[in-house]
Amino acid sequence: MLPENGRILCALVILFLIFSFAVASLPRNISTSSFQAGGSASLGKDVQEAKAKLQAGINTWDSELLKTARDLFINCLMKSKADNAYILYHIALADYRLIAFYLSSKMNDEAEKSLIEAQKYLEKCMALDPSFGEANALYGYLLGFEIALHPEKAMTLGPAGFNYFSKALAKEPENPRIHLLQGISLFYTPQEYGGGADKAMESLTKAVNLFEKEAIVDPFKPSWGKEEAYTYLAAAYKQKKNYEKAKELLKKALEVNPDFGLARKELSGLEKSS
């Protein structure tokens, strides 16, 4: 029979082996930041609920749903045991959607407030997880919104935005949302400043191809954008007057998300004009 000290040591060794096996068995696509947030099933469900609400707001272009989604992400952050890079990112993502809504509605003061909030949360996110390239890409896109609000800053913010996209791609070259955000940015950037439909098509085609391979399991990770990649690629083809290809891509966008209002509106317009 083992002496008392020997039995304690044996028990500790067994516990260590059990713990080591459990850690080795964890899915590799679950990030450290998910565990920092508590990694609980209930928090994961809360994040998924907030994501669904945000997507509903995007589908219908409803600012109240977008604001509700943001509040839900804030609640998730408050429930987490520590700051979580993915939750911080999603708060900024909700602000990004609100900025787009406010700018399209000529509500520049509201857009300015949301921009400040989005940048604040993304700066925290990037500091918490420097390897999270997608946060850099979203920050770069936000600088485009800042230029829209303050055109006099274009000479400094324009190159800064490209720099953030370069850093994002260096960190996560196979992330489809980085290519999507870059493609949208290039689509709205005049050709003489390095943008245009052709440049946008390169990034958006890459995004579409990467989205086809992506399978997100972790509920905390970003999972948006596939239908938008098809829709903006369609917009680039439309600008090049390739209307049949544009319609084909819009139909694919609606296969991904039948409720996506922008794709439905664009497809309806093309079908009426053809």
Label every PLM stretch briefly:
Residues 1-6:
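N-terminal secretory signal peptides that target proteins for export/translocation
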Residues 23-100, 105:
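N-terminal leader/linker segments that initiate helical-solenoid repeat arrays
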Residues 86-87, 135, 178, 217, ...:
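TPR alpha-solenoid repeat register
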Residues 234-238:
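Outer membrane beta-barrel transmembrane domains
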Residues 239, 248-274:
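A cross-kingdom marker for long, charged
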